[in-house]
């Protein structure tokens, strides 16, 4: 494994630790804002606020005119962004940590590339198709579904910390560029509805999932986070998931080590996390994982050594010999003697 691969694994775990801390902080923030919601006063964004938040002067159109293309209007207690309809040249918009319930004014921003609307009171991320939007973040709102999201160049979509029960409306034809989907910390009861062929990174931790289903054909998926769910079995994985390298199943309910055999068809899986599952308390836990998945390089936080691999290979060979004997029809058969 290359040094770059090592760094990728460390980055994945570090991102997870930081995200866990972020979720806790946002949950505290959400409780505070919900308690204070009755005290919110209507606060529309004003020209003065726009003047303060605008930056990045660029040429527009034929290059003879100029306009500011970046707006930061974060944490201003905003409830209304209607004024943005007239700022059609904006490409980068941050309206996080406000009290916004309606983002329809953003439909006019047809040049928008980057949108951050975290920590508001949105119940939907629905917008008109924005042809150039590449990154959109709606984390820690009150969003209840995934309908109305169809931007052809959207590569990263963050919906963590919302109230989504089911994934619907994510059309692979209209989200053909989506490579990263963040749904951590919702109320998902199923992984169905996520057939997005270009998807590389999928974050489903801290939901209510009991099984994996509907992900079998995600052939480009490299990272799958399923931590802190209620998964008991490892059904739902297939050899079509030929790019999957990192699988995090920490803090689920997997008790039977035999379930690990269902991961053998993942040809590129090299890092698996199963900490805080009942099966991780078994005596032969690490050995059994390597016996089932010869290509595995790391289990939880520890890498396998050469001695571990040699021992696992011996066990595999012994099991194969025993299986071959069981299948041999001539083994231990009494010789046939014709009657006298």
UniProtKB/Swiss-Prot annotation:
Q: Where is this region: Disordered?
A: 1-38, 317-340
| Alphabetical list of InterPro entries matching this protein | Leu-rich_rpt, Leu-rich_rpt_typical-subtyp, LRR_dom_sf, SDS22/Internalin_LRR
- According to its UniProt record, in which tissues is this protein expressed? Expressed in the testis (at protein level).
Respond yes or no to whether keyword Coiled coil is given for this record.
yes
Q: Name one GO biological process term.
A: flagellated sperm motility
Biased composition, class Acidic residues, residue ranges:
1-27, 323-333
User: Under the cellular component aspect of Gene Ontology, which terms does the record hold?
Assistant: cytoskeleton; cytosol; sperm flagellum
LRR repeat placement: 89-110, 111-134, 177-197, 198-219, 220-241, 243-264
User: In its keyword annotation, does this UniProt entry include Nuclease?
Assistant: no
Q: Where in the cell is it found?
A: Cytoplasm, Cytoskeleton, Flagellum axoneme; Cytoplasm
- The segment(s) forming the LRRCT domain are 277-315
What phenotype has been reported when the gene encoding this protein is knocked out? Mice show male infertility due to impaired sperm motility but do not show compromised respiratory ciliary motility. Disrupted assembly of radial spokes seen in the sperm flagella.
Please give the coiled-coil regions recorded for this protein.
Answer: 305-328
Q: What keywords would UniProt list here?
A: Cell projection, Cilium, Coiled coil, Cytoplasm, Cytoskeleton, Flagellum, Leucine-rich repeat, Repeat
Q: Report residue spans for region: Interaction with RSPH9.
A: 205-340
Name the domain of life.
Eukaryota
**Subunit comment:** Component of the axonemal radial spoke complex. Interacts with RSPH3A and RSPH3B. Interacts with RSPH9.
Spell out the PANTHER family in the cross-references.
Answer: LEUCINE RICH REPEAT CONTAINING 23, LEUCINE-RICH REPEAT AND IQ DOMAIN-CONTAINING PROTEIN 1-RELATED
What is the stated purpose of this protein?
Essential for sperm motility and male fertility. Plays an important role in the proper assembly of the third radial spoke (RS3) head and the bridge structure between RS2 and RS3 in the sperm flagella.
Name this polypeptide is given: Leucine-rich repeat-containing protein 23
- Gene designation: Lrrc23
């Amino acid at each position: 494994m290359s040094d770059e691969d090592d760094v990728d694994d460390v980055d994945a775990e570090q991102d997870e630790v930081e995200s866990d801390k972020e979720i806790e902080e946002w949950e505290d923030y959400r409780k505070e804002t919900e308690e204070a919601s009755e005290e919110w006063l209507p606060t529309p964004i004003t020209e003065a606020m726009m003047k303060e938040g605008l930056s990045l002067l660029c040429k527009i159109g034929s290059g003879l005119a100029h306009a500011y293309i970046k707006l930061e209007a974060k944490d201003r207690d905003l409830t209304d962004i209607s004024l943005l309809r007239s700022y059609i040249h904006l490409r980068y918009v941050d309206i996080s940590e406000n009290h916004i319930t309606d983002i329809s004014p953003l439909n006019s921003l047809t040049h928008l590339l980057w949108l951050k609307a975290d920590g508001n009171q949105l119940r939907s991320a629905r917008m008109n198709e924005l042809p150039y939007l590449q990154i959109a973040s709606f984390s820690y709102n009150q969003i209840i579904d995934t309908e109305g999201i169809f931007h052809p160049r959207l590569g990263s979509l963050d919906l963590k910390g919302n109230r989504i029960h089911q994934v619907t409306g994510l059309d692979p034809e209209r989200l053909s560029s989506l490579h990263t989907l963040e749904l951590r910390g919702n109320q998902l009861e199923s992984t169905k509805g996520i057939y997005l062929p270009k998807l590389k990174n999928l974050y489903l931790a801290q939901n209510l999932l009991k099984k994996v289903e509907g992900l079998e054909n995600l052939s480009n998926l490299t990272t799958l986070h399923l931590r802190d769910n209620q998964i008991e079995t490892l059904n739902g994985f297939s050899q079509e998931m030929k790019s999957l390298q990192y699988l995090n199943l920490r803090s689920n309910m997997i008790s039977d080590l035999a379930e690990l055999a269902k991961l053998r068809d993942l040809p590129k899986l090299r890092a698996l996390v199963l900490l805080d599952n009942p099966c991780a308390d078994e005596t032969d836990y690490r050995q059994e994982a390597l016996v089932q998945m010869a290509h595995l390089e790391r289990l939880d936080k520890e890498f396998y050594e050469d001695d571990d691999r040699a021992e696992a290979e011996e066990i595999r060979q012994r099991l194969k010999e025993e299986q071959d004997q069981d299948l041999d029809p001539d083994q231990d058969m009494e010789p046939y003697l014709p009657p006298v």
